[in-house]
């Protein structure tokens, strides 16, 4: 079955839709890619999607976390070594670049790579050769390099901790993965996806989430992004004693960190009273406007966020006089 990018990168926010389209275009090209995004946004998922949609899809995809391997071992891990190259090298060993030959290697957290090793990586990108530690022979490899970082490598270049020539060689195509707080409209979709996976593992247990709890998840900023949301849904499902995740189950830090969806209305009663219809219309207008902002102008996603049918949402939109961003909304009408 062909790899489906939309199943790996779930969401309907314009940012994720554009990302999926970019992956499709980049996958077929034999260029290096630099993926930047906060921790937990899914940079490895993006890299794997590029690999799986590329002509190299039947070959190896080798992820390497440069921050998780001690600096003195990273060169040997990546390039391999000859017997006796260093203390403990009892035999020769291929490196991960050779393992990824004809496939793709992901160098995650590449900003942690020692600057001396960066020069050796640059030669791989320019000449396509790998020289194991302790060897005077170079081996030719055909490997696509994708790099990822949760920090701005441009700043690292300015500080002198990252080679400028390697930086430009890596970001032939730069990809930025948006944090989850910038595409809140996808939180219900992601939550349901994670719950569905849990249901598949435990088919006898049907777990749902209350509307109030979903609003709290939507309102939270998720500093750990999609990974944090996934872990939270898993945790809540495990601790759920019945079939519904409700507000009482949410941790205090999540509830406290959830921002109000819209500013409160300040109502002052006087002798003449208030016009309740006008107040309701004003509140509806604020909520609709906030939902449209969070969904990038996507009416369908905004309607779902507010629990409304599309026709009802459109009617309220007209009644409240809210103008949706036309440039974004046109893409969903086609």
Question: Where does each model-flagged region fall?
Answer:
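Nucleotide-binding/hydrolysis machinery
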Residues: 2-17, 21-24, 54-59, 134-144, ...
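Conserved post-Walker A coupling segment in P-loop NTPases
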Residues: 8, 15-87, 98-114, 142, ...
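Conserved RecA-like P-loop NTPase ATPase core
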Residues: 19, 41, 64, 78, ...
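Conserved helical "switch/dimer-interface" subregion of ABC/ABC-like ATPase nucleotide-binding domains
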Residues: 22, 53, 81, 120, ...
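Bacterial C-terminal helix-turn-helix
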Residues: 48, 268-334
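Base-recognition residues in the alpha-helical recognition helix of bacterial helix-turn-helix
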Residues: 52, 119, 123, 131, ...
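AAA+/SF3 P-loop NTPase mechanochemical coupling elements
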Residues: 60-65, 91-102, 106, 114-120, ...
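Short gly/ser/thr-rich secondary-structure transition/capping motifs
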Residues: 84-91, 127-132, 155, 268-271
């Amino acid at each position: 079955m062909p790899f489906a990018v939309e199943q790996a990168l779930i969401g309907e926010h314009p940012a994720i839709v554009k990302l999926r389209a970019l992956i499709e275009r980049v996958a077929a090209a034999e260029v290096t890619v630099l993926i930047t995004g906060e921790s937990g946004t899914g940079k490895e998922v993006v890299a794997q999607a590029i690999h799986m949609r590329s002509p190299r899809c039947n070959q190896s995809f080798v992820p390497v976390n440069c921050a998780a391997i001690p600096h003195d071992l990273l060169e040997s891990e990546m390039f391999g070594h000859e017997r006796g190259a260093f203390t403990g090298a009892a035999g020769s060993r291929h490196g991960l670049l050779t393992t990824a030959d004809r496939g793709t290697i992901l160098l995650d957290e590449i900003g942690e790579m020692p600057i001396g090793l960066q020069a050796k990586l640059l030669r791989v990108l320019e000449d396509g050769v790998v020289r194991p530690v302790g060897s005077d022979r170079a081996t030719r490899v055909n490997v696509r390099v994708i790099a990822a970082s949760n920090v701005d490598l441009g700043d690292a270049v300015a500080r002198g901790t990252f080679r400028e020539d390697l930086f430009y060689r890596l970001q032939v195509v730069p990809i930025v993965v948006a944090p989850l707080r910038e595409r809140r409209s996808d939180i219900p979709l992601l939550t349901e996806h994670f719950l569905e996976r849990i249901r598949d593992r435990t088919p006898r247990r049907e777990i749902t989430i209350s509307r109030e709890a979903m609003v709290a998840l939507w309102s939270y900023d998720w500093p750990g992004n999609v990974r944090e949301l996934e872990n939270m849904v898993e945790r809540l499902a495990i601790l759920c004693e019945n079939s519904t995740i409700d507000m009482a189950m949410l941790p205090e830090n999540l509830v406290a960190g959830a921002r109000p969806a819209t500013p409160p209305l300040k109502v002052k009663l006087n002798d003449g009273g208030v016009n309740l219809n006008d107040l309701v219309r004003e509140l509806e207008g604020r909520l609709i406007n906030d939902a449209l902002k969070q969904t990038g102008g996507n009416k369908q996603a905004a309607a779902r966020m507010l629990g409304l049918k599309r026709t009802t949402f459109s009617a309220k939109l007209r009644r409240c006089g809210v103008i949706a961003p036309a440039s974004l909304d046109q893409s969903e009408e086609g």
